[in-house]
Amino acid sequence: VEFPYSDDEKYIELEKRARAELSMPSMRRSRLKKAISMKGLVTAIEAHSGITGLIAEKTVVYSGGGARQFDAMWISSLCDSVMRGKPDIELVDITSRLRTLDDIMDVTTKPVIFDGDTGGLTEHFVYTVRTLERMGVSMVVIEDKTGLKKNSLFGAQAAQTQAEVSDFCEKIRAGKNAQKTADLMICARIESLILEKGMNDALSRARAYTAAGADAVMIHSRKREPDEVFEFAEKF
């Protein structure tokens, strides 16, 4: 709810109370799923610190008599690594990632999508899911890679290994079983197109991952044209 601008003390106090409630984990966690249900298409922008979170929170574009703003924030592992001067190889540990997340959530109210890299070991991912859910995160995205994680933009030029479908499905199932509520969504990011394994492999994995319990899938492409992304969306 956006209250109309007013200098009236009642409105200011009402807005302050509303924003305080929206920042609570139980309120924030469910809002992305509700937004998707209501709008269909939602927009998210990357944030990797308290100040970038505030920029995402407060950016509003007024046009044609209406106002547009971002629906959610994406907490990127790439940007979280780069701002520390570290390579994007899952070097920044989960405790540090969660500290960044907490800094952002402390000063914002928008729903959060957390980039969870590969999710780590299945046994570790279970605890990550529980922590993210408790903090009020709306979605965690994990990619189907194994071994040393490399940035996807390298594609097949860098040695990267895609996880076995059965192993990744087990990780998804373990994460879903660890949840205490239905609010947190697990999104399976598919690297088939990045690793040049073809559309059929991507579609086969997408169906397997959703059958395992994934709430959403993300398809990744390095190409400048969006054709293969659109093709995937149409066929899936």
Residue positions per predicted region:
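Extended, hydrophobic interaction surfaces within ordered domains
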Residues: V1-L14
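Alpha/beta enzyme core
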Residues: E15-F236
